[in-house]
């Protein structure tokens, strides 16, 4: 809409130029007016291009349909003589009859086309039963969601699974999920955003585990943001689990809406929007901003990336990613990692509202496009940006991490083997609810 107004303005000024030239018979006053008008046209053309760039960037991350990719693979044992999909004609191939069944069937159809007929298949109830069958060579190959390789390695006795297999075929199965326009139902004065960081590089649309799970509770009137961090191993239920508890990080394997459902259930709160990015997008955004200044309350090193000192640290994208991912350097492990992740989010918010970024908007937009996904409408984004430009007051940002007790349990995603989980601390969860409601009701 702003672009249309500017284009109309350009047309009007062009008409004024011709009228002015005719009326003045090319005398100096007319020429001077024409020069001024041409200068105005140049400025407005730049404005059109800038706004179009904003429009294109915003549209790229706020599509009406969200693309979700599932990277499906065919794997065999490392020492197998099978090297290609065409070698599978005489072999028994395993697959799991689970949430990925539609994607598995598409891969099986590709196998059938490759071997020139119907191959031999055996269905399993879960990934671990299928892996056991591959190990004892009941089956010779398996159709698998690649994201589940890391899940399998979390199981006791399966830690070296990836080193025992080789992938002979891979294909991305693409689904399009309709994004509901929430611009009319949400209140931009107060809202909750789910920030999801998935554990992959490359294409942000690939479904994977969500290792960063932060709720940002925002009050745009009082300029207050409350960050609530939930550890990746929190033992929770989610919409897909039918009441069976699972790791919070595994909820992301079934889509971002599933992660949102888990947190809404845990904290009794409605999540209005989500922002989802992976490692690559995280690095791109921070580098586009010229880096961020992050406060560290610990002195530690992440080899070979950087040594972090107590106090302010200016970090590039890869340095910020290493800071946010590290947990082995701390006695508190994942809890400290969550605290550091919120420090990074705080630094990003502060940088995004700085004059340095506003003056460098073009480069920022180049870095943002395609780096993340969100269901926030372009109208809501424009409204928030406009309000921040009018009132450039800094936000007060508070953070809180819920904790729990570590234990070994079976989960919805890992029903046949035990894995480390964190049983939620009820008092912490209740305090987080109070903090959330404190912002929404203040």
Model-derived regions: residue spans:
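Membrane-embedded alpha-helical segments of integral membrane proteins
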Residues: 1-21
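Membrane-water interface of alpha-helical transmembrane segments
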Residues: 3-6, 27-33
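N-terminal secretory targeting and juxtamembrane "stalk" segments of secreted and cell-surface proteins
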Residues: 20-24, 33-34
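Hydrophobic alpha-helical membrane-insertion segments
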Residues: 25-27, 43, 58
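Internal/C-terminal transmembrane anchor helices
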Residues: 29-52
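Hydrophobic alpha-helical transmembrane segments in integral membrane proteins
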Residues: 46-64
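Non-catalytic, solvent-exposed segments at the cell envelope interface
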Residues: 59-70, 75-78, 84-442
């Amino acid at each position: 809409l702003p672009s249309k107004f500017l284009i109309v303005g350009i047309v009007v000024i062009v008409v004024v130029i011709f009228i002015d030239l005719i009326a003045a018979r090319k005398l100096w006053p007319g020429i001077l007016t024409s020069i001024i008008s041409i200068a105005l046209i140049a400025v407005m053309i730049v404005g059109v291009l800038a706004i179009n760039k904003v429009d294109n960037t915003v549209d790229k991350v706020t599509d009406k349909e969200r693309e979700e990719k599932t990277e499906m693979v065919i794997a065999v044992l490392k020492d197998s003589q099978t090297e290609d999909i065409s070698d599978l004609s005489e072999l028994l191939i395993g697959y799991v009859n689970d949430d990925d069944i539609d994607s598995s069937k598409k891969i099986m159809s590709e196998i059938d086309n490759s071997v020139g007929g119907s191959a031999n298949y055996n269905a399993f109830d879960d990934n671990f039963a299928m892996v056991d069958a591959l190990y004892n060579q009941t089956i010779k190959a398996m159709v698998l969601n690649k994201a589940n390789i890391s899940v399998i390695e979390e199981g006791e006795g399966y830690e070296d699974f990836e080193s025992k297999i080789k992938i002979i075929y891979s294909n991305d199965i693409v689904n399009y999920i309709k994004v509901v326009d929430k611009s009319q139902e949400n209140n931009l004065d107060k809202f909750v955003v789910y920030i999801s960081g998935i554990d992959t590089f490359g294409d942000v649309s690939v479904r994977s585990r969500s290792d960063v799970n932060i709720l940002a509770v925002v009050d745009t009137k009082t300029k207050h943001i409350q960050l609530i961090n939930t550890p990746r191993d929190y033992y929770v239920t989610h919409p897909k689990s039918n009441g069976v508890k699972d790791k919070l990080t595994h909820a992301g394997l079934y889509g971002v809406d599933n992660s949102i459902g888990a947190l809404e259930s845990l904290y009794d709160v409605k999540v209005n929007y989500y922002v989802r990015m992976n490692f690559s997008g995280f690095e791109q955004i921070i580098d586009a901003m010229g880096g961020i200044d992050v406060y560290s309350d610990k002195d530690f090193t992440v080899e070979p990336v950087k040594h972090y000192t107590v106090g302010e640290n200016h970090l590039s994208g890869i340095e910020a990613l290493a800071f946010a991912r590290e947990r082995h350097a701390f006695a508190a492990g994942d809890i400290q990692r969550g605290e550091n992740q919120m420090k990074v989010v705080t630094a990003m918010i502060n940088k995004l509202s700085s004059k340095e970024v506003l003056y460098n908007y073009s480069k920022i937009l180049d870095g943002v496009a395609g780096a993340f996904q969100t269901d926030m409408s372009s109208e809501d984004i424009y409204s928030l940006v406009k309000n921040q430009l009018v009132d450039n007051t800094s936000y007060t940002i508070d953070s809180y991490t819920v904790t729990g007790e570590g234990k070994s349990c079976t989960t919805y995603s890992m029903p046949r083997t035990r894995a480390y989980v964190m049983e939620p601390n009820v008092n912490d969860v209740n305090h987080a609810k109070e903090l959330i409601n404190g912002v929404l009701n203040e």
